[in-house]
A protein has these predicted regions:
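Conserved helicase ATPase core of P-loop NTP-dependent helicases/translocases
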Residues: 52-122
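Short, solvent-exposed loop/turn segments at secondary-structure junctions
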Residues: 22, 29-34, 45, 91-92, ...
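Conserved SF2 helicase motif VI
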Residues: 144-167
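Structural motif
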Residues: 25-27, 117-119, 137
């Protein structure tokens, strides 16, 4: 709840993500002042990192967990926790990049049930084909419109939404 005091942009993105019906792509060229604060905010909200250690220490996290499909808080063992992934050029921050890209684009993840949110840096802004992206958020200022178009193009690709029902073949 306090994130709004420090970053209204991250606060608004988190509000929109909670209403998401599919995979969410978020771009920032900044790691220390973009991707990491956003990842920490996601963890605080109840989203865990896919297969890697969370950036927060475990005892600092609240006991709230977000369901990957409904995006509602859940507890217990009978739900599928929402996960995020970081795709960057930094090996320490993205040690399993190839595996996570494979899961992200797999047809079993078309609804985000395995990885719901993908945070990308400039390293993934060109040459990577994502599938079934339903939302694209750009955290950075719009100083470079060509870069912005490239990032939006990661989520809107020819035939990238064909596994989804017709009414869900859109990106916001």
């Amino acid at each position: 709840n306090n994130i709004k005091k420090y970053s209204n942009k991250i606060y608004e993105i988190l509000k929109i993500i909670k209403k998401s019906n599919g995979i969410v792509l978020i771009y920032s060229q900044y790691i220390d002042s973009g991707i990491i604060p956003l990842a920490l905010a996601l963890e605080e909200m109840g989203v865990r990192r896919y297969k890697d250690k969370n950036l927060f220490k475990k005892d600092q996290l609240k006991n709230n967990n977000i369901d990957a499909i409904t995006m509602e808080e859940r507890s217990g063992d009978n739900f599928n926790q929402c996960c995020y992934s970081i795709i960057s050029g930094n090996v320490k921050l993205s040690p399993n990049k190839k595996e996570e890209l494979s899961i992200l684009t797999d047809k079993t993840n078309k609804d985000g049930s395995k990885i719901k949110i993908v945070l990308i840096t400039r390293a993934a802004s060109e040459g990577v084909d994502f599938k079934n992206i339903r939302q694209v958020h750009i955290l950075d200022p719009w100083y470079n419109l060509n870069r912005t178009d490239q990032i939006i193009g990661r989520g809107i690709r020819n035939l990238s939404h064909c596994m989804l029902p017709y009414k869900k073949r859109n990106v916001s």
